[in-house]
Amino acid sequence: GVTFGNNTFVGVGSSGNIVRSTDNGTSWDNATTDNSTANNLSGVTFGNNTFVGVGSSGNIVRSTDNGSSFSTVTSPTSNNLFKVAFGNNTFVAVGSSGNIVRSTDNGTSWENTTDSNSMLYVSWSEVSEVGSNSQIRVKSYDNSSWSTIDGDGNNGINLIGSRNATNPSMADNGTHLFAVWSEDDGAGNGLIRSAVYDNNSQAWDFLNSNYQALNNSTSNSANNPQLLYNNSSLYVIWSENNGTANQVRVRQFDNSSSWNLVDNIGANTTGINKDTSRNAINPKMMNFNSEIYAAWSESDGTASQIRVAKFDNSSSWTFVDGNSSTGINKATGKNATDPTMAVLSTKLYLSWSETNADNRTQIRVKSYDGSSWSFVDGDNATQGINKDYTQNASYPQLVTVTEGNIENSTDNGVSWNNATSYSSSSKLYAVWLEENGNSQVRVAEFDGTSTWSFKDGDSFDGLNINTAKITGKPSAVAYLNQLIVAWSEINSLGVPQIRVASSPF
């Protein structure tokens, strides 16, 4: 790397070599350095009359005499550092495994900063060792080891440990980890609970000071919540029975203690269903073109339809699925369930499970360019992207993995968020569960046009640890430029285990 400052060019390179020129690059001399380890240096910058270089094994050097001599400073990381920059009296360096370090004292001392993309979180529902109630458990992964962050006791993060809790969902805004789940009220109704993890106290705090559930009515049962962090706001979507039918409800967090309903469509104040007299289930949200899109499965009286609506970030939802009595199904007379969404380049992709004429469920995929929907699964009436279209496939997940993340900080480098980036190197993956005598976790990659290629070995079996054992529905996320897949799988003792795998598989 090379930089310029105070009429001086400074270049850094292999084996800790540092050179400088004070005559506009005509001649160069070696700078003196105490870099005894001779680590390679790859980045250098200038700010506030100081040159700072960074390199392998977390090596950091600085010069305050116009590049004549460099001294090694204590680094908070042993990960390789690639680049360094200066701004607002702060040096920031970035490196491998999502590592980001900063200095606010002219490069004298450095600290690790919070990078939301450097931690992986997994949550699930597990029966307690004491009693028979299911608890919400949470673990974090720092790219080397797993840590329990739910108290590690008999109870998880349930509000009431003696109540069953299921269907957790999490979201990270860069400074806090949020969780929602459905918890039994003791009478068989599901209550949507919400909590935030405090990194300092390492404890979970409930987002409502009076522990009020998020349900529109706590006398109604609600389930399948999902969180989405969008435009500095936190949203939650879920399905709630109003005594007549299941309604899709949405709330927005005010970043303090209140959740406000934002689920009106015109005169409809009971949710965002197309028909509020019909059941709507399994809702999901995704950010696309700076707006929130929601997709869910809703009955039309004959079959379940995939419905899609978008939110204007104010108060209004608009259907983008044709706004007719049917949705975007391949066959509107067949049941379609479990929608999932992701964004690749300039398009929104939506996948779901739909029954074909042979009563076999297929994984279907459509893309949306902001005005129209197109099938990208072969557009075949009989088969979707299943490994074997004669077998049932269900619970799809879509994930975009970008090779090279963009991080942004608005607090002088203290914390960092993963910015939305869909470069030409981004890849779209589909993950689902498919039968072959046993349930298998399957993974396929989209080529951006019309072809899906299997990335799970492309054989009879999928990712399962033991392909002869039953698995539960998978979950998938992007983490440090990799696809991470988690699922529940029965072990040899007949006990479900949470399994996690990373690409390449």
What are these model-predicted stretches?
Residues 1-5, 9, 13, 33, ...:
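Extracellular, repeat-based ectodomains that mediate carbohydrate processing or recognition
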